Amino acid sequence: DALAWIKAEMKRSRRNFTSRIHYLNANKVPHADLFFPEDEAELDAPPRIRRHSPEIYETFRKEAAKGFEGLVGNPFSRDPRFLFGDMGTPKVDEPTTSQLLRNAVTIVKRQTAHTIKDGEFIPSRFAKKDFIAFVDPAQPLTREMMEKAVTMEFRHVLARNPREAELKRFVALMEKNVKDAGRTAGVRYTLAAVFLLPDSVFRRELGATPDGEGRARLQPEEIAHALAYALTDKRPGSLLLDAATKGKLNDEAGVREVVDSLFDDPKLQKPRILRFFQEFFEYH
């Protein structure tokens, strides 16, 4: 009959009919047996620091090096030892560090690109207008200018202002670098250091003080990053950062409200949702 002929043809073409039917068996497992709330194991989520996923860095790379993406490479790759692509150990070896440094210097050089012709300072058409003033010899490099340069790069790389201690440390570094290497090199390599800060390479989930069961709630800033990276490949946007600053992520109700806002935003791309299932079920 027709069914027997189909089975024979599939077998002949090495597309075993019986084996393919077995693929559907998993769909017959009751949902409650797979995801039954009362059978949840105790939470085992110790504090951790892990490297950004290749996708997160790729998004940042394309934004930071827009127009010259070919000059800036992605130093991160998948670790086949781990089921989830962003669960690898936070290892950054020498080749990775070298690529990160090259990327940082390349981007900063583009931000401040210029030439000197007959003693005249000429900004490049690739330069960023807001950054070019920091290497223009016609404008005094005051402490206020240095603070502005550091703050702008922090916003560009980390989407936040530098903390007081960070600002003080980077201004001191810029003063030393300018004195030792000259204005252009000193400014550039100081700003490049922002790209190598731990927050630009790693994601932290350390939490606050643990409770009686050893569980520690993430800090608001950590929750903002966790939510962003759970749905997208981008660093937290203004909605998440504002929510963290204003205390909206301090309790479950506030977090739920922010999550609902993210899901309700039709313009927000959420590639991590599909990728989660692809990684969890090893379906690609």
Which role fits each region the language model picked out?
Residues 1-284:
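Low-complexity, glycine/serine/threonine/alanine-rich intrinsically disordered linker
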